[in-house]
Amino acid sequence: MAEHLKIIAIEKETHDVLHITTEKPENIKYHAGQAADISINKPKWENELRAFTFTSLPTDKQLEFTIKTYPQHNGVTNQLLTLKTGDTLLLHGVFGTIAYKGEGLFIAGGAGITPFIAIFKQLERDGKVGDNKLLFANKTHADIIQEKRYKALLGKNFINILSEEKLEGFEYG
């Protein structure tokens, strides 16, 4: 049976990415990097499951999801744009094997950064960011999720590549 997740807040992270915060059921268990099958608790959408990564930590008092939207597709992520505080998502199950296995280079493109959001939060909380590096590819500067946070956290170890925009201070390709 699906867990009901009441939405506490919805914020725009970028022009096409939402940050959704929900209440957290007591029995939910997951680790940084894992995802959940989520649907929207509205007629015709309850069985439209999509995988979204937890961007909160297991010890947080709420759940957070950072989700790229695709309004032109008229699908689940477009429906997320219609939600408001008090609406409900349905959590159908937790899965995934992405986990921190030691210092190294994290490589992400666009919304593919979401498993690393929670992993870097955990490393920061534990004081173990170390010499980890993040190579983050996006189409444009406006697409970069949590840019200020990663600049502050990683400094020179936060490397950005833009594929559709040439800007000083960013790799291009």
Which stretches of residues belong to each language-model region?
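Ferredoxin-reductase
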Residues: 2-85, 138-140, 163-165
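FNR/FR-type flavoprotein reductase catalytic core
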Residues: 72-173
